[in-house]
Amino acid sequence: MAKVLVLYYSSYGHVETMAQHIVEGAKSVPGVEVTLKRVPETIPVDQARAIGVKVDQAAPVATVDELADYDAIIFGTPTRFGNMAGQMRTFLDQTGGLWMKGALVGKIGSVFASTGTQHGGQETTITSFHTTLLHHGMVIVGVPYACSGLVNMSEITGGTPYGATTLAGADGSRQPSANELDIARYQGKHVAELASKLAS
């Protein structure tokens, strides 16, 4: 049985919502075990609450060592100046031991993200994230254009061939759209299908 981990960091809930729909898509594939976890918050709780960070999230916090237990990992992060959030970077910077063992070599790595604006760095966030995954020897999987949501021109929407994305709005008030969530589900299903084939 293939094991898929959806691992995310979410400040205000947008990436958390996307992660839940990626899980939904992955779970639609028979014979795949799907786990949802998040990386630790690095901002002190009192300060995080003061700036509106969603501190209380249902997903348990992951440990670095458990990454080796999965056949595929789908990472989710908000954008910080065109790169992944510091919380995710801090977590990944602790994976040196896994790298030394080659523990993630040959496993699937996939990424989804959120940005504040339409051109706020969603693609650079995902592609720069890929660098770390490639150093670990992971096999990168994105979202193929077989996903019809990628060519939706009827609205302003996230979604790239590199991975699912959502636009949060400059003030965080915009929630993931139906199209963005469809793309997220597609990514989860696509990764789970490939993980199942590789694990068989």
From Swiss-Prot:
The keyword Oxidoreductase applies. It comes from the Bacteria. Transmembrane segments: none annotated. PROSITE patterns: FLAVODOXIN_LIKE. It catalyses: a quinone + NADH + H(+) = a quinol + NAD(+); a quinone + NADPH + H(+) = a quinol + NADP(+). Binds 1 FMN per monomer. It holds the Pfam family FMN_red. NAD(+) binds at residue 12. GO terms for cellular component: membrane. GO terms for molecular function: flavin adenine dinucleotide binding; FMN binding; NAD binding; NADH:ubiquinone reductase (non-electrogenic) activity; NADP binding; NADPH dehydrogenase (quinone) activity. Substrate binds at residue 99. Its cofactor is FMN. Keywords: Flavoprotein, FMN, NAD, NADP, Nucleotide-binding, Oxidoreductase. FMN binds at residues 10-15, 79-81, 114-120, 135. Signal peptide: none annotated. The keyword Lipid metabolism does not apply. Residues 4-191 form the Flavodoxin-like domain. Its EC number is 1.6.5.2. Belongs to the WrbA family. This is NAD(P)H dehydrogenase (quinone). It comes from Burkholderia cenocepacia (strain HI2424). The lineage of its organism: Bacteria, Pseudomonadati, Pseudomonadota, Betaproteobacteria, Burkholderiales.
